[in-house]
Amino acid sequence: MVSSLSRNGNSHHNGVNVAITSGFSTKLAPLPNGPLFGTDGIRGKAGDLLTAPFALELGFWAGQVLKANKVTPGPVIIGQDSRNSSDMLAMAMAAGLTSAGLEVWNLGLCPTPCVAHLTRISQAMGGIMISASHNPPEDNGIKFFNHEGTKLSQTLAQQIEDGLRGHLSFDRDRNREWGKTYHQANLVDTYCQFLQETLPENLDLQGMRVVLDLAWGASVEVAPKLFKALGAEVICLHDRPDGNRINVNCGSTHLDLLQQAIKEHQADLGFAFDGDADRVMAVDSQGRVVDGDYILYLWGKHLLEQGKLPHNLLIGTVMANLGFERAWEALGGQLMRTAVGDRHVQAQMWETGAILGGEQSGHIICHHHSFSGDGVQTALHLAALVRQSGESLATLVNESFQTYPQILRNIRVEDRDRRRYWQECTPVMEAVNQAEAAMGNTGRILVRPSGTEPLIRVMVESCSADDANYWVNYLVNVVEQHLAN
């Protein structure tokens, strides 16, 4: 156990150290200089920052902060995806939380929105999900929820980080209130029942053939169970927990195998989830990708026609396609854009009273039912919408909108400061301004650092595919030359 931390950090390791492992060493090394919490909690390679001793210490300080700010008296609920490091991190977090005197409910393997939902309905003090979402197997992450099942505020996240860095004091020797851990995998059934209750009464998917790509991840049990319960014929890909293969060439960011399976099985539609099932991408019977923009349009139109969409308002992000925006406006709707990240979408939904929002990448939030993105719920509701329409998903997509050609490229930039302050690089800004001036109102450009990976993302969108391709290549070359090297 790392020793007590003082306000000035004068412990034997200065209060700013975490364990790194070589084999099973607990040799201490400094925390990184930048913020620990990104847009979706703490992420990194398992065994580097994310070790058992670090998670133990993080759990302890999270427990102290949650206790000090508690609104409800209940437990802290922990879930995890299938990564090989998830057991280790979940158990270490539980040990840290119980050392702070808190009760822990461990759900085991489950989707992230399952943790969020159960946290909200159980009077829990907070929730924790061990997952790196769509990232590769060697990565992992720790994300926090407040008692309402929404993401922990930046203020509380900073307090937890202050504890880790030795800027808060606590005499551990006087702490004699130990918590307990309870294994509550059965509560995942409560979440499944909730999802069914959000669907139209007497919904019957008999005769619908659905392919599910479960990405070797957190949705392997929940998604097939629910679709089968509704009568659908279900064909599953990557359908068992596999910590070595989670997200590898499968799931919501790799749709080739799903598209192939839909054609081979002559399926009506298919869905691909990411590793923790908080996002989903759909594919129609023709093999076309139905991304978050299409899902928002179709679900939004359905709610608009029922009079259940306040102000005809959808919340999207800066990545939302112009074709989607202009088609939605033609229906009398309005699209409000936020920065990328479901945290920003959620905040804008609360501020405006919107009940439907999401991202092109497949994070969809519907306040009629939930307060967090839920891939399985979104897939079920899209299937329900298709069944109620009497049309195929392919027909609904044909009748919706044409996307503008949009090209997204990722450039690996290891230097964190170069990613954060890319706008201070004069050659890059000059190139962006040049491209924007050339395209005028026929397209747009977005350059931004990833919030979860060491990448700078360059997106160019234009009514002309040739223009989009030309300018994205031009900008990528400039970014690689001045930021990546």
Swiss-Prot record:
Pfam families assigned: PGM_PMM_I (PF02878), PGM_PMM_II (PF02879), PGM_PMM_III (PF02880), PGM_PMM_IV (PF00408)
Cellular component, GO annotation: cytosol
Gene Ontology biological process terms in this record: carbohydrate metabolic process; peptidoglycan biosynthetic process; UDP-N-acetylglucosamine biosynthetic process
Enzymatic reactions: alpha-D-glucosamine 1-phosphate = D-glucosamine 6-phosphate
InterPro entries: A-D-PHexomutase_a/b/a-I (IPR005844), A-D-PHexomutase_a/b/a-I/II/III (IPR016055), A-D-PHexomutase_a/b/a-II (IPR005845), A-D-PHexomutase_a/b/a-III (IPR005846), A-D-PHexomutase_C (IPR005843), A-D-PHexomutase_C_sf (IPR036900), A-D-PHexomutase_CS (IPR016066), Alpha-D-phosphohexomutase_SF (IPR005841)
Cofactor binding, per record: Binds 1 Mg(2+) ion per subunit.
EC number(s) recorded for this UniProt protein: 5.4.2.10
Entry PTM: Activated by phosphorylation.
Domain of life: Bacteria
Residue numbers carrying Phosphoserine: 133
Keyword Hydrolase in record: no
Cofactor names: Mg(2+)
Purpose: Catalyzes the conversion of glucosamine-6-phosphate to glucosamine-1-phosphate.
Name this protein carries in UniProt: Phosphoglucosamine mutase
Organism: Rippkaea orientalis (strain PCC 8801 / RF-1)
Organism classification: Bacteria, Bacillati, Cyanobacteriota, Cyanophyceae, Oscillatoriophycideae
